[in-house]
């Protein structure tokens, strides 16, 4: 014989135990974790297939320095060539002035949407290649009384269509021809769809569509103070978003040109009004000068007076130029602005010089003073008049060749690929989310519903553990097979004591057999009851195999299936269910002939019988006591398999007739609280439970180290 002993030392560090338990809990639930993660990933894949793709189009525009008006050029020089105000231009691009014209140009206030199944319909149409079907509607109006109605356009074929509403309106139209009926006007320019395809036609307000465009439009400056703006527009239709963005850039350019042209026009109007007045004043000044010369016999000015006169004329010309500049700059800034203050300071300096020159003129003889004054008026008037004529010609050229300050660098183009949804990112995120949620769920379930994880946990609370039965992999592989209706069916070969008598679980049951031999020596009778804390914990498995291993010691054993609701021992042992316990207790069968032999020697069975409506009442009858007395006198051991004590009271009733009671609890399933509650139920009924059998102990992912177990395997040599 060869003995293999596997021993693991108990871990004493509490922190290490907790970490190991958490990791082990996750590893044990790995299939649930992987399944949950796979479901999340599958949902993500389905979403990416059926989600509406969002595309992106972009364009590039440049805002150049002001180049149309010479007056504005001079102002820019006063502003020290400050770069264009990109923030203001961005707001202008997003304004109702620009976007409203785009809505009108492209008829964006009219929406035509293909009718599909909810949620997945549009995605299915894309997968089938039918997402490009369209109807182009350029005109659609309806009375205010019909504003709440839903209009549906149905394609009839041969360039015909039918327009109906949920309010009872119905009309037929032809492509390219206006439809007018009951105040409803529609013009369809093109149809590219199969007959019987339906579309919903909606009319939105211009303001609502402008808001929609603003939500989908992004304008950013490329670099800092470059004056280059990047426009991005997103939407579901690749062609439409390109057309919308091209329209926005075109309308922005046109409004800039229109504004510049309007500016030049206003300046021309101002000059046209001023020129006659200036010419009139010039004529008056010339007449006065000529009259004075004739009166004084053509007086000549000395060189000093002529120099003063030239300086005064030059200063007047500069002051007049500043007047034009001030007229322009006052439209842009207040007097507190640095540029405006610079202009005012320059004017003040010229006026101071002019005052000094006037002082010098005052010191001259009166005749020279008058000649200087009249000559200055004429020459200043001539300069002003010529300036105005030059400005007029410049503005006429500017108005005729206005190009604005905006240049479209890159027209709109739709980027290849899909902007949203990002399939790889969504799938990866779903996998991570599914993994995290499943792990958190496993840990929370383990935290709030921690089952018994060691016999020591029971013994520390004063509960005797009679046996610790490991989970049998052999039994697990040959366990119940479910039929179509979900009812468990068993085969006789599945009884572990017969199919694999050397299994560790059977060795543990043999150890239990030895313990019972001494435990029942002082019992009032040879009747042993096995009950359970809850259902599906392997109680019947323990009971049947215990009966089998005891019968192998040449003792006569009778197993009574007292679970008249769900008992299946007859299927497990390969006997019939005729004349079972319920039939005997109901008086339909004889006690003396109720025991049925099984395929195992010295092992008889009383099956549960037909399912009665009142199992508890039958167990309380005197006939059940007679059955127990009869069985106790004819068998060496009577085993009674009862339902779980927490589910029904049958075990408490049967317990009054037995000498020994053991309770089965399942490892990592039943909690300590459940065991204590079950024992309390028996105490309330005056029944003493000898101890607990801990069933289905399995090697956890963290091993048996947590419990300091010793696992023995003793097999025959292969020689």
Curated annotation (Swiss-Prot):
List the GO cellular component terms.
Answer: plasma membrane
Residues exposed to the Periplasmic side:
52-423
Role this protein plays: Required for the extracellular polysaccharide colanic acid synthesis. The autophosphorylated form is inactive. Probably involved in the export of colanic acid from the cell to medium.
Instruction: Check the record and name the CDD domains matching this protein.
Output: BY-kinase
Question: What molecular functions are annotated in GO for this chain?
Answer: ATP binding; protein tyrosine kinase activity
Q: Which Pfam families match?
A: AAA_31, GNVR, WZC_N, Wzz
For the modification Phosphotyrosine, the affected residues are 568, 707, 709-710, 712, 714
What does the record give as the reaction this protein catalyses? L-tyrosyl-[protein] + ATP = O-phospho-L-tyrosyl-[protein] + ADP + H(+)
Transmembrane regions: 31-51, 424-444
Question: Keywords assigned by UniProt?
Answer: ATP-binding, Cell inner membrane, Cell membrane, Exopolysaccharide synthesis, Kinase, Membrane, Nucleotide-binding, Phosphoprotein, Transferase, Transmembrane, Transmembrane helix, Tyrosine-protein kinase
Q: How does it sit in the membrane?
A: Multi-pass membrane protein
- What pathway, per the record? Glycan metabolism; exopolysaccharide biosynthesis
| InterPro entries per the UniProt record, alphabetical | AAA_dom (IPR025669), Bact_polysacc_biosynth/exp (IPR050445), GNVR (IPR032807), LPS_length_determ_N_term (IPR003856), P-loop_NTPase (IPR027417), Wzc-like_C (IPR005702)
Free-text activity regulation comment from the record: Dephosphorylated and activated by wzb.
Q: What is its EC number?
A: 2.7.10.-
Q: Which SUPFAM superfamilies match?
A: P-loop containing nucleoside triphosphate hydrolases (SSF52540)
Name one process (GO BP) from the record. polysaccharide biosynthetic process
Q: Which organism is it from?
A: Salmonella typhi
Which gene is transcribed and translated to give this protein?
A: wzc
Chief location of this protein within or outside the cell = membrane
Enumerate the subcellular locations listed in this protein's record, separating them with semicolons.
Answer: Cell inner membrane
Residue ranges annotated as Cytoplasmic topological domain: 1-30, 445-719
What is stated as this protein's family in its record?
Belongs to the etk/wzc family.
Q: What is this protein called?
A: Tyrosine-protein kinase wzc
Q: Posttranslational modification, per the record? A: Autophosphorylated. Seems to be phosphorylated through a cooperative two-step mechanism. First, Tyr-568 is phosphorylated in an intramolecular reaction that generates a significant increase of protein kinase activity. Then Tyr-707, Tyr-709, Tyr-710, Tyr-712 and Tyr-714 are phosphorylated in an intermolecular Tyr-568-dependent reaction.
């Amino acid at each position: 014989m060869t003995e293999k002993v596997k021993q693991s030392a108990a871990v004493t560090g509490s922190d290490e135990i907790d970490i190991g338990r958490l990791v082990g809990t996750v590893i044990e639930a790995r299939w649930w974790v992987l399944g949950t993660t796979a479901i999340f990933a599958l949902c993500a894949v389905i979403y990416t297939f059926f989600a509406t793709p969002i595309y992106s189009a972009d364009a590039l525009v440049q805002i150049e320095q002001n180049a149309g008006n010479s007056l504005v050029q001079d102002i820019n020089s006063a502003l020290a060539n400050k770069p264009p105000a990109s923030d203001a231009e961005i707001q202008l691009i997003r304004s109702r002035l620009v976007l409203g014209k785009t809505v009108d140009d492209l008829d964006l206030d009219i929406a035509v949407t293909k009718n599909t199944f909810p949620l997945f319909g549009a995605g299915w149409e894309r997968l089938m290649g039918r997402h490009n079907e369209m109807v182009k509607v350029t005109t659609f109006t309806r009375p205010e009384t019909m504003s709440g109605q839903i209009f549906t356009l149905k394609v009839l074929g041969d360039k015909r269509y039918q327009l109906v509403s949920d309010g009872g309106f119905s009309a037929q139209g032809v492509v390219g021809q206006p439809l007018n009926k009951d105040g409803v006007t529609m013009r369809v320019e093109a149809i590219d769809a199969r007959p019987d395809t339906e579309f919903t036609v909606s009319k939105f307000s211009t303001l609502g569509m402008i808001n929609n465009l603003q939500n989908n439009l992004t304008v950013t400056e490329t670099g800092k103070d470059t004056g280059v703006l990047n426009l991005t527009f997103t939407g579901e239709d690749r062609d439409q978003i390109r057309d919308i963005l091209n329209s926005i850039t075109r309308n922005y350019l046109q409004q800039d040109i229109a504004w510049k042209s309007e500016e030049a026009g206003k300046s021309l109007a101002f000059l046209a009004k001023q020129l006659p007045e200036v010419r009139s004043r010039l004529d008056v000044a010339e007449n006065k000068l000529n009259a004075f010369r004739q009166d004084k016999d053509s007086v000549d000015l000395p060189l000093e007076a002529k120099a003063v006169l030239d300086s005064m004329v030059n200063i007047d010309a500069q002051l007049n130029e500043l007047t034009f500049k001030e007229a322009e700059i006052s439209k842009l800034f207040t007097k507190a602005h640095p540029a405006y203050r610079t202009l005012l300071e320059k004017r003040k300096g010229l006026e101071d010089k002019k005052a000094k020159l006037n002082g010098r003129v005052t010191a001259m003889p009166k005749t020279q003073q008058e000649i200087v004054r009249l000559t200055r008026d004429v020459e200043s008037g001539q300069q002003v008049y010529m300036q105005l004529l030059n400005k007029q010609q410049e503005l006429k050229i500017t108005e005729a060749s206005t190009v604005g300050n905006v240049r479209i660098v890159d027209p709109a183009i739709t980027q290849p690929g899909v902007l949203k949804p990002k399939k790889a990112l969504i799938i990866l995120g779903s996998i991570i989310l599914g993994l995290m949620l499943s792990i958190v769920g496993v840990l929370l379930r383990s935290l709030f519903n921690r089952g018994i994880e060691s016999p020591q946990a029971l013994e520390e609370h004063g509960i005797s553990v009679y046996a610790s039965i490991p989970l049998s992999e052999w039994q697990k592989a040959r366990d119940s097979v479910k039929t179509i209706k979900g009812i468990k069916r068993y085969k006789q070969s599945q009884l572990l004591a017969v199919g694999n008598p050397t299994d560790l679980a059977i060795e543990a049951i043999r150890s239990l057999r030895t313990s019972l031999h001494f435990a029942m020596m002082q019992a009032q009778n040879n009747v042993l009851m096995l009950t359970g804390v809850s259902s599906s914990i392997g109680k019947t498995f323990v009971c049947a195999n215990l009966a089998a291993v005891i019968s192998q010691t040449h003792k006569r054993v009778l197993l009574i299936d007292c679970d008249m609701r769900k008992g299946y021992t007859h299927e497990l042992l390969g006997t019939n269910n005729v004349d079972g316990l319920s039939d005997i207790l109901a008086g339909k069968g004889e006690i003396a002939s109720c025991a049925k032999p099984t395929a195992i020697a010295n092992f008889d069975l009383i099956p549960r019988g037909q399912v009665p409506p009142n199992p508890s009442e039958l167990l309380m009858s005197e006939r059940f006591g007679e059955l127990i007395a009869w069985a106790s006198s004819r068998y060496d051991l009577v085993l009674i398999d009862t339902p779980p004590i927490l589910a029904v009271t049958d075990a408490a009733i049967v317990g009054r007739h037995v000498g020994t009671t053991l309770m089965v609890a399942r490892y990592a399933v039943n909690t300590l609280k459940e065991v204590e509650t079950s024992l309390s139920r028996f105490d309330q009924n005056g029944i003493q439970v000898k101890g607990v059998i801990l069933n289905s102990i399995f090697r956890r992912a963290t091993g048996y180290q947590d419990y300091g177990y010793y696992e023995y395997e003793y097999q025959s040599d292969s020689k």
